[in-house]
């Protein structure tokens, strides 16, 4: 029959035909997706529920004028299975994948809340940073040359060649927000700050270097879009979802994206309410270092993991890269194609513009002066110095 787009009715038919519900079951289906690239259906018969996710052959946010390969659904399914191999507690269960229809049937996580929404609503999620730090350490280590034999790594790397979605990252994170491109989207009150940003040749040179790192450093399997909208949370659980951007890339990329999205939430808050975000930023890094170090010492397969001076260099490089990637993400999410509710949801215009100016200034500083952030404490200092000097 070939590919066709599911509807709520045909999603029910698909689920019944594949044995997820009895033929006579009274199944309720709702399309619940709010993303840019897929349909997401929740199906429930009152006793059990599942999620059916289908990749569309175009970007919903733009329309059919932006075609995309549906093979990304297979990449997403494989990535979730790789993640589950190393950190099963932090990803949903994948029940099946249909490559022809680009359909993946996965565990329903309705008991949890999208982390971005929870943070905006004031939730703290005390275990978020511990779980994400551990998730990142295990996935990045075990899919790198340090935790995987080089032959196996090369094979796995080939599995995750993801040209369509990697091109989106190249354009929307590293290129378009730094010049006059039609994809950019911002309020006119920001124009003077943006003009200054776009005329900063030192900044552009640094961004060029980070784009080059993304293009060429195939260090480990990365999620590729690890923002707080790609994580479900509760006070006791954390689940990473939507790795359709998964590819081999730099160690620091996912860490930087996650940190940037915590910073965006921090910027949406009054100063005295930001401490929980810095707790998570600092703890994410410390848990990452703790877990990565244990794996390096106990599970390292590369000969030079036995050299004691090598690990500190690796960790410093990862952190420095993460800071720069975080800066790119801050700018992209403020003036690029895909914004975040943390900033756009600020009702008071003056406060919203101030927060966005702060995000742009902070992003610029993190990219240009990432070397100033030699450790997590200096990172916080740079935040305070930069944000404190920006007014609406």
Curated annotation (Swiss-Prot):
<keyword id="KW-0028">Amino-acid biosynthesis</keyword>
<comment type="subunit">
    <text>Homodimer.</text>
</comment>
<feature type="binding site">
    <location>
        <position position="38"/>
    </location>
    <ligand>
        <name>ATP</name>
    </ligand>
</feature>
<dbReference type="InterPro" id="IPR009212">
    <property type="entry name" value="Methylthioribose_kinase"/>
</dbReference>
<protein>
    <recommendedName>
        <fullName>Methylthioribose kinase</fullName>
        <ecNumber>2.7.1.100</ecNumber>
    </recommendedName>
</protein>
<comment type="function">
    <text>Catalyzes the phosphorylation of methylthioribose into methylthioribose-1-phosphate.</text>
</comment>
<dbReference type="GO" id="GO:0005524">
    <property type="term" value="F:ATP binding"/>
</dbReference>
<dbReference type="GO" id="GO:0046522">
    <property type="term" value="F:S-methyl-5-thioribose kinase activity"/>
</dbReference>
<keyword id="KW-0418">Kinase</keyword>
<feature type="binding site">
    <location>
        <position position="53"/>
    </location>
    <ligand>
        <name>ATP</name>
    </ligand>
</feature>
<feature type="binding site">
    <location>
        <position position="332"/>
    </location>
    <ligand>
        <name>substrate</name>
    </ligand>
</feature>
<feature type="binding site">
    <location>
        <position position="225"/>
    </location>
    <ligand>
        <name>substrate</name>
    </ligand>
</feature>
<feature type="binding site">
    <location>
        <begin position="242"/>
        <end position="244"/>
    </location>
    <ligand>
        <name>ATP</name>
    </ligand>
</feature>
<comment type="pathway">
    <text>Amino-acid biosynthesis; L-methionine biosynthesis via salvage pathway; S-methyl-5-thio-alpha-D-ribose 1-phosphate from S-methyl-5'-thioadenosine (hydrolase route): step 2/2.</text>
</comment>
<feature type="binding site">
    <location>
        <begin position="107"/>
        <end position="109"/>
    </location>
    <ligand>
        <name>ATP</name>
    </ligand>
</feature>
<dbReference type="GO" id="GO:0019509">
    <property type="term" value="P:L-methionine salvage from methylthioadenosine"/>
</dbReference>
<keyword id="KW-0808">Transferase</keyword>
<dbReference type="InterPro" id="IPR011009">
    <property type="entry name" value="Kinase-like_dom_sf"/>
</dbReference>
<keyword id="KW-0486">Methionine biosynthesis</keyword>
<dbReference type="InterPro" id="IPR002575">
    <property type="entry name" value="Aminoglycoside_PTrfase"/>
</dbReference>
<keyword id="KW-0067">ATP-binding</keyword>
<comment type="similarity">
    <text>Belongs to the methylthioribose kinase family.</text>
</comment>
<keyword id="KW-0547">Nucleotide-binding</keyword>
<dbReference type="Pfam" id="PF01636">
    <property type="entry name" value="APH"/>
</dbReference>
């Amino acid at each position: 029959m070939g590919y066709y787009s599911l509807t709520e009715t045909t999603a029910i038919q698909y689920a019944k035909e594949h044995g997820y519900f009895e033929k006579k079951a009274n199944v309720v289906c709702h399309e619940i997706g709010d993303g840019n690239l897929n349909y997401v259906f929740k199906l429930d018969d009152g006793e059990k529920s599942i999620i059916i996710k289908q990749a569309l052959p175009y970007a919903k946010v733009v329309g059919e004028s932006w075609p995309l390969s549906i093979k990304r659904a297979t990449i997403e399914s494989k990535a979730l299975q790789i993640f589950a191999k190393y950190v099963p507690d932090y990803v949903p269960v994948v029940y099946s994948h249909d490559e022809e229809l680009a359909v993946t049937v996965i565990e329903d996580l309705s008991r949890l809340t999208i982390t971005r929404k929870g943070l905006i609503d004031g939730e703290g999620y005390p275990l978020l940073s511990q779980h994400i730090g551990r998730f990142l350490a295990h996935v990045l280590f075990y899919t790198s040359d340090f935790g995987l034999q080089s032959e196996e790594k090369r094979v796995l790397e080939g599995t995750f060649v993801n040209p369509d979605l990697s091109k989106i990252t190249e354009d929307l994170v590293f290129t378009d927000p730094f010049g006059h491109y039609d994809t950019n989207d911002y309020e006119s009150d920001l124009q003077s700050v943006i003009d200054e940003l776009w005329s900063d040749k030192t900044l552009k040179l640094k961004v060029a270097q980070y784009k080059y790192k993304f293009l060429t450093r195939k260090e480990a399997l990365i999620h590729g879009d690890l923002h707080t909208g790609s994580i479900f949370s509760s006070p006791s659980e954390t689940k990473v979802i939507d790795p359709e951007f998964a590819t081999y890339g730099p160690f620091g990329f996912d860490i930087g994206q996650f940190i940037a999205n915590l910073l965006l939430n921090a910027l949406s808050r009054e100063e005295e309410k930001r401490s929980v975000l810095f707790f998570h930023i600092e703890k994410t890094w410390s848990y990452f270092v703790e877990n990565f170090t244990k794996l390096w010492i106990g599970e390292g397969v590369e000969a030079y993991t036995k050299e004691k001076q090598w690990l500190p260099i690796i960790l410093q490089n990862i952190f420095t890269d993460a800071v720069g990637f975080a800066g790119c993400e801050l700018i992209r999410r403020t003036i690029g194609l895909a914004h975040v509710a943390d900033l756009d949801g600020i009702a008071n215009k003056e406060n919203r513009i101030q927060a966005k100016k702060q995000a742009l200034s902070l992003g610029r500083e993190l990219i240009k002066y990432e070397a100033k952030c030699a450790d997590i404490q200096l990172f916080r200092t740079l935040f305070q110095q930069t944000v404190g000097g920006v007014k609406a």
